Amino acid sequence: EFHRDITYQMEILGREHADFLGASVDRTVYTPGTFDMPLAVKKMLTEGDVDAVVTLGCIIEGATEHDEMIASQLTRKIMDLSLEYDKPVALGVPGPGMTKLEAQERIDYAKRAVEAAVKMVKRLREKT
């Protein structure tokens, strides 16, 4: 996986925060990069009993504008999947335009994404 040194720390922090919030992480799918996330998200939403999905990763700036295109498409597609399956899909993917150092400084985005997913699940249940 791209930038596994960073995403591993995000995963650990996200799991700890989920446990703190009383949520369980029942399934984890590792993707080679953020470009591959939408398919994994769709599989998780269609297979099994999933209340929400949290995406964790980082998009680091390269020599071209590729990072901006990937970030734009990723956010759009996971938003589409959330709406299509009526389940929260939280974005824990900082970027684009970041250096590796900036990505390391944003590892706590994992906590924010987990918290957003848990809050959305609770709020959606309140409305039904």
Pin down the residues of each PLM region:
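Glycine-rich phosphate-binding loop
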Residues: 39-78
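A charged, well-structured terminal subsegment
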Residues: 107-128
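Short, acidic/small-residue loops that bind anionic groups at enzyme active sites
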Residues: 70-95
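Short beta->alpha junction loops
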Residues: 26-35, 95
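Glycine-rich phosphate/diphosphate-binding loop of Rossmann-like nucleotide-binding domains
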Residues: 1-30
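Phosphate-binding/catalytic loops
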Residues: 96-108
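Short, ordered loop/turn segments at secondary-structure junctions
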Residues: 1-2, 57-59, 93-97
